[in-house]
């Protein structure tokens, strides 16, 4: 991974822990997790809106087709 050996990664993690401390890293992890959760929630809501729009368009198209068929039958 990134040209680093496992030993180098462990040393890097230890240095990061020493610099930032576990409390700051825990808070940063919590903040990152909350941001990801919010992003996923927004994506789901956006999908629901799109689905509702597609359903309304499908309903409009179906009703327009029915009206068109009725007009052709009456003609």
UniProtKB/Swiss-Prot annotation:
<dbReference type="GO" id="GO:0043953">
    <property type="term" value="P:protein transport by the Tat complex"/>
</dbReference>
<dbReference type="GO" id="GO:0008320">
    <property type="term" value="F:protein transmembrane transporter activity"/>
</dbReference>
<feature type="transmembrane region" description="Helical">
    <location>
        <begin position="1"/>
        <end position="21"/>
    </location>
</feature>
<keyword id="KW-0811">Translocation</keyword>
<keyword id="KW-0813">Transport</keyword>
<dbReference type="Pfam" id="PF02416">
    <property type="entry name" value="TatA_B_E"/>
</dbReference>
<dbReference type="InterPro" id="IPR006312">
    <property type="entry name" value="TatA/E"/>
</dbReference>
<keyword id="KW-1003">Cell membrane</keyword>
<keyword id="KW-0997">Cell inner membrane</keyword>
<keyword id="KW-0472">Membrane</keyword>
<keyword id="KW-0653">Protein transport</keyword>
<protein>
    <recommendedName>
        <fullName>Sec-independent protein translocase protein TatA</fullName>
    </recommendedName>
</protein>
<comment type="subunit">
    <text>The Tat system comprises two distinct complexes: a TatABC complex, containing multiple copies of TatA, TatB and TatC subunits, and a separate TatA complex, containing only TatA subunits. Substrates initially bind to the TatABC complex, which probably triggers association of the separate TatA complex to form the active translocon.</text>
</comment>
<dbReference type="GO" id="GO:0033281">
    <property type="term" value="C:TAT protein transport complex"/>
</dbReference>
<keyword id="KW-0812">Transmembrane</keyword>
<comment type="function">
    <text>Part of the twin-arginine translocation (Tat) system that transports large folded proteins containing a characteristic twin-arginine motif in their signal peptide across membranes. TatA could form the protein-conducting channel of the Tat system.</text>
</comment>
<dbReference type="InterPro" id="IPR003369">
    <property type="entry name" value="TatA/B/E"/>
</dbReference>
<keyword id="KW-1133">Transmembrane helix</keyword>
<comment type="similarity">
    <text>Belongs to the TatA/E family.</text>
</comment>
């Amino acid at each position: 991974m990134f040209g680093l050996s496992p030993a180098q990664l462990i040393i890097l993690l230890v240095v990061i822990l020493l610099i930032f401390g576990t409390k700051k890293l825990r808070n940063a992890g919590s903040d990152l997790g909350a941001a990801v959760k919010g992003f996923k929630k927004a994506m789901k809501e956006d999908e629901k809106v799109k689905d509702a729009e597609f359903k309304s368009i499908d309903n409009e198209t179906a009703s327009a087709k029915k009206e068109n068929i009725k007009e052709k039958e009456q003609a």
